[in-house]
């Protein structure tokens, strides 16, 4: 059992320590790999963490693809999407009562209990 408890953290930490064990990290829009030295037929396109090079196969034309493109808002025309995105406000009504009101209501519902007697203090 102790051996299992020692082996489990080692298996969890192994991919963190040894990069080859967990596989090389992807870079350059997932077309390259982070390595210390590029292999034959690969070109350095960028730098990765820990002073590694982003190695991309040089036989293909790799260009950075923009991740987002601006969407013009002025050219949009109202349509079915506007009907879907319309938010309708509704009002919910809640009845708020205090603890005192709740106690009075519960005492009135019991009917069998008597109220506490008045206590007079003499000075």
From Swiss-Prot:
Residues 100-110 have a biased composition (Basic and acidic residues). GO terms for cellular component: extracellular region. It is found in: Secreted. It holds the Pfam family Defensin_beta_2. InterPro entries: Beta-defensin (IPR050544), Beta_defensin_dom (IPR025933). GO terms for molecular function: lipopolysaccharide binding; membrane destabilizing activity. The three-dimensional structure formed by the three intramolecular disulfide bridges is indispensable for antimicrobial activity. The keyword Secreted applies. One of its GO terms (biological process) is antimicrobial humoral immune response mediated by antimicrobial peptide. Residues 1-19 form the signal peptide. Keywords: Antibiotic, Antimicrobial, Cleavage on pair of basic residues, Defensin, Disulfide bond, Secreted, Signal. Residues 100-123 are annotated as: Disordered. Disulfide bonds join 27-54, 34-48, 38-55. Its main location: secreted. Residues 65-123 form a propeptide. Residues 112-123 have a biased composition (Polar residues). Host defense peptide that exhibits antimicrobial activity against both Gram-negative bacteria, such as E.coli and S.typhimurium, and Gram-positive bacteria, such as S.aureus and B.subtilis. Inhibits cell adhesion of E.coli on intestinal epithelial enterocytes. Causes rapid permeabilization of both the outer and inner membrane of E.coli, leading to morphological alterations on the bacterial surface. Binds to bacterial lipopolysaccharides (LPS) with high affinity, and may thereby be involved in immunoregulation through LPS neutralization. Belongs to the beta-defensin family. This is Defensin beta 118. It comes from Gorilla gorilla gorilla. The lineage of its organism: Eukaryota, Metazoa, Chordata, Craniata, Vertebrata. The gene is DEFB118.
């Amino acid at each position: 059992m102790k051996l299992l408890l020692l082996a489990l953290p080692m298996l969890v930490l192994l991919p963190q320590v040894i990069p080859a064990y967990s596989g090389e990290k992807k870079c350059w829009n997932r077309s390259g790999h982070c390595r210390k030295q590029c292999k034959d037929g690969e070109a350095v396109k960028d730098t990765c963490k820990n002073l590694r090079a982003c190695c991309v196969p040089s036989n293909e034309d790799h260009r950075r693809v923009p991740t987002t493109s601006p969407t013009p808002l002025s050219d949009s025309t109202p349509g079915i999407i506007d009907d879907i995105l319309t938010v309708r406000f509704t009002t919910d009504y809640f009845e708020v009562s205090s603890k005192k009101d709740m106690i009075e209501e519960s005492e009135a519902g019991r009917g069998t209990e008597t109220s506490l007697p008045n206590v007079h203090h003499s000075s």
